[in-house]
Amino acid sequence: HILWVDNPLNLTIFSGERIRIQGDNGSGKSTLLKLICGTLHPSSGELYRSEPLNILYLDQEYSCIDNDLTVYGQLEACTSRKPEHELKILLNRFLFTPPTWDKKCGSLSGGEKMKLALCRLLVCDNAPDLIIADEPTNNIDISSMDILAATLKSYEGTLLVVSHDEHFIRDVGIERAIKLLNAQAE
C-alpha cells in the first residue's frame, strides 16, 4: 500500500508543539508515526529530522517496556541518578503497590504498562525530546487515564497524539491537528 503518491506529504513539526494526528483507518497514521520515529524509511522523498532526537514511542503494545524486567527493575534500568526511595514513591503515585514491584512486566495489563512507561518518562536520565502516543487511552481505566493526561499535560517537550478521545485531547493541551484524508495531510 503506497501512501501520499499524488499529493506528497509536507509536514513541519516545531519543538514544543502539541499535535493531534487524525485520519480514517488506512489513512497512514501509523505509517507517519513510524517515519517520524525512524523505524520506517520513506520509499521516496526525503525526511528531515533534528539529530539526535530522543523519542518515546508509546505504541499500543508498549514496546518501550522490557517484559523481562520487574516493575521496579524497569525504573532502575533507566536512571543512575534517582535513589531507591524516590523510585518507590513514584511507583506508589502511579498506583503500583509494593507487592507489584517485583512483578515481571510481561504479566502487566496494557493500562499498567502505560503507567509504567510514564514512570520511566519521569525518571529516565535522558528525557525524550518527543513523545508519540498512539491511541494511549485504549483499554485503560479512569484513574489510569487521569494519570496519563496529567503526565502528558505537564510534559514540556513535543507531543504527537493519535486519539479519538476528545476529552483527553483537550486535557493534554493539543494545539494543532493534522488530518490525514485520502492518504494526504490537510
Question: PLM features: residue spans?
Answer:
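ABC ATP-binding cassette signature C-motif
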Residues: 1-186
